[in-house]
Amino acid sequence: MKLKETLNLGKTAFPMRAGLPNKEPIWQKEWEEAKVYQRRQELNQGKPHFTLHDGPPYANGNIHVGHAMNKISKDIIVRSKSMSGFYAPFIPGWDTHGLPIEQVLAKQGVKRKELDRAEYLKMCRDYALSQVDKQREDFKRLGVSADWENPYVTLTPDYEAAQIRVFGEMAKKGYIYQGAKPVYWSWSSESALAEAEIEYHDLVSTSLYYANKVKDGKGVLDTDTYIVVWTTTPFTVTASRGLAVGADIEYVLVKPAGETRKFIVASELLNSLSEKFAWEEVEVLNTYRGDELNQIVTEHPWDSEVDELVILGEHVTTDSGTGIVHTAPGFGEDDYNVGVANGLEVVVTVNERGIMMENAGPDFAGKFYDKVAPIVMEKLGDLLLAKEEISHSYPFDWRTKKPIIWRAVPQWFASVSKFRQEILDEIEKVKFHSEWGKVRLYNMIRDRGDWVISRQRAWGVPLPIFYAEDRTPIMTEETIEHVAKLFEEHGSVIWWERDAKDLLPEGFTHPGSPNGEFTKENDIMDVWFDSGSSWNGVVVNRPELTYPADLYLEGSDQYRGWFNSSLITSVANHGVAPYKQLLSQGFALDGKGEKMSKSLGNTIAPSDVEKQFGAEILRLWVTSVDTSNDVRISMDILSQVSESYRKIRNTLRFLIANTSDFNPTTDAVAFEDLRSVDQYMTIRFNQLVKNIRDAYENFEFLTIYKSLVNFINVELSAFYLDFAKDVVYIESAKSLERRQMQTVFYDILVKITKLLTPILPHTAEEIWSYLEFENEDYVQLSELPEAEDFANQDALLEKWNAFMDFRGKAQKALEEARNEKVIGKSLEAHLTIYPDAEVKELLESLNTNLAQLLIVSALTIAEGDVPESAVRFQGVSFTVERAEGEVCDRCRRIDPTTKERSYNATICNHCASIIEENFAEVVAEGFEV
């Protein structure tokens, strides 16, 4: 036997190298086969419910880092709730209708208009479901625990029927109406868009300054007067029917030198416009308030048969332009509102593909709307005063990345204005985890217009509306419920497979159809109505979930998307918000803080992270950043996270190894019988437990990460475990001192493994497999630890916190001695302490082996004068010299009692007593040399 074998060196097969890319799929397969998710739900049956409702990602392509961050965050929350006494099933979902899938099929060569509608929809459905399967595997590979066998998918018959019923309740309350309002129109998609489907980019546009001649001045202006207007959309001049002025804005009538014409412009803008138009010596003839110009008639710049009426508009400002806005009610929301209020004609001169129509005039018909500025300028002739190219923020179709226009077309709307206050009142009841989130959603609802819910596309849920022979829309409770039942049985494809009369209840009649003939709506619903109905299709209809849901958690872009549409439909149906709490996340940016883009080559695929580091590192990264704001990710950042993981893993490996001979049932020591330092560490750990439990409760992942890493690196590794080796390696295996420390080790090991489970389930499960005395076969089936309180813990903490301050000073003194080559390692030191009365009382009260705690071979508490050479601090001074004696081959301390023993060992008296007591046979025979 060798001397080294008398040490209690920790033994474990738990590997230092994690091998996560290979091990994670093995664990995931085992969990699936053992039905761990289902068993967790069974364990929690009858407990308080917690419903985190999954916002459905769009089923197209592999998941990206943003998807991963979101789903991992949800998984951490649901796992922590499941381990905290809540019944918290997690039903993942997918959004499956919409234009992107139509575009994919088009790229694959599918000709939509050459196919039967039902056949085309089947192709869309098959593609969508293939993407659901692909993304499901992506999410499972992240270690997300969910009911993967029973997700919700917005194309299933039960979901579509639930969506129709949401629509039906809104129709019943009078919230659904048809109108020809201007809407965001995407010529590239040939469809109306919702606000959530637009994004803003800079665009260079041609802006024109031109003049309308006064036709009837109403006794205020002469007919040789011209009113100057500005437009950034020249094509809309073809449909201009009015000029809007601000009622309280001051306007001036001016005559520039050399001009026979007189002009009206906003007084505030006269100087800048004079420079722009090269007007010199401008004579101001008169001033007017805007309301004095109201109802003056001007003529269209190139069509004298068309009148343009001066009207008042609250949207008019003097921030730019001329202070007068040309009004084309068919091409703008403000234009429409003020135009209709003043009886202006609503004219639309652009078709669904962005092509100018016949009613624009022969010079324009057949041309693309964005290419007609030169024709407009030619038609304006000397009425054109200036032309500029301007760069401004402009709305684009978020899918095709092409600019859009406002265009009045017959559409179906959901009225928000009818119950807006009810929605705002519900927002006040929701718990937001950021105040700016509440303000953002509140302002969006307060300021938004009615919701355009119709789309002129193929792949989606049909609007369940019929038309009588006289074109009266029909959407009664009876007809809508009948359609819902048909969808429930056959899916929405039946809408396209049957004639209208076969979709109506048997024997249905309507006064508008004396001949019994009916037609059906061809438009589909906005996809935001699809996902916005999920509270009904999933949360209400799944018995394991509770409505309203406890939490919605998505990216901050969903304030105008899913958060918004879900809120509107839920309040419209039931008068309540669909969520009790709302939590939003920022976007994942690259390492430089730039937006990720395939074209820039700066994207990081979750699959690449899994191959290089493992999903655990991606999961740990999610907790290491503040996800409420935009976050950065790169392979370098993940390498740093991987290093944190390595430290966590190796620390826990040390605890596993050094409790391998510990049975918590027979060997554990009661708290009151622990040494003071062990009690201190137990109390500090329980403070960590409380902090982490609170952080889980408040979804504060970064707090968990920082608390955990700090505890492991600073309090455990750099303090407790640092000196613990002297005890657990050197003392007798069954000694009280060793068992005291092992009690603390085991308690921390078991509880920290549980605390880590929501974040690092694969690693926690691997650790758990080495804990033979724990009852649950999977750590996921255990409960998170509760923080304990101990008698006199505040006094104990105060004392040991003071010691930690003292320890920091002692370490500085040792470091100085090391720098001066007095010692090498701290174990070579004899540390002499010169304390004041307060520090001396503290050290004596600890009743502990200070040399052991400070990892020195000898320690003296001295009285009397402090030597000149001492390192001085407030309240205490130190001297450091080399300890006397020889190095013990067993404990590595320098000890004056170290000598060669008769059994071939050069060791100190303390180690000799341990060997002679526990290894009598070796003492007799001697150690191997």
UniProtKB/Swiss-Prot annotation:
A GO CC term attached to the entry: cytosol
Residues holding L-isoleucyl-5'-AMP: E554
Cofactor note: Binds 1 zinc ion per subunit.
Ligand binding (Zn(2+)): C888, C891, C908, C911
Cofactor or coenzyme needed: Zn(2+)
Gene3D superfamilies: 1.10.730.20, HUPs, Ile-tRNA synthetase CP2 domain-like
Motif 'KMSKS' region, chain ranges: 595-599
Motif position, 'HIGH' region: 57-67
Matching CDD domains: Anticodon_Ia_Ile_BEm
Keywords tagged on the record: Aminoacyl-tRNA synthetase, ATP-binding, Cytoplasm, Ligase, Metal-binding, Nucleotide-binding, Protein biosynthesis, Zinc
Subcellular location: Cytoplasm
Family: Belongs to the class-I aminoacyl-tRNA synthetase family. IleS type 1 subfamily.
Domain notes: IleRS has two distinct active sites: one for aminoacylation and one for editing. The misactivated valine is translocated from the active site to the editing site, which sterically excludes the correctly activated isoleucine. The single editing site contains two valyl binding pockets, one specific for each substrate (Val-AMP or Val-tRNA(Ile)).
Record-given protein name: Isoleucine--tRNA ligase
Organism encoding this protein: Streptococcus thermophilus (strain ATCC BAA-491 / LMD-9)
Gene name of the record: ileS
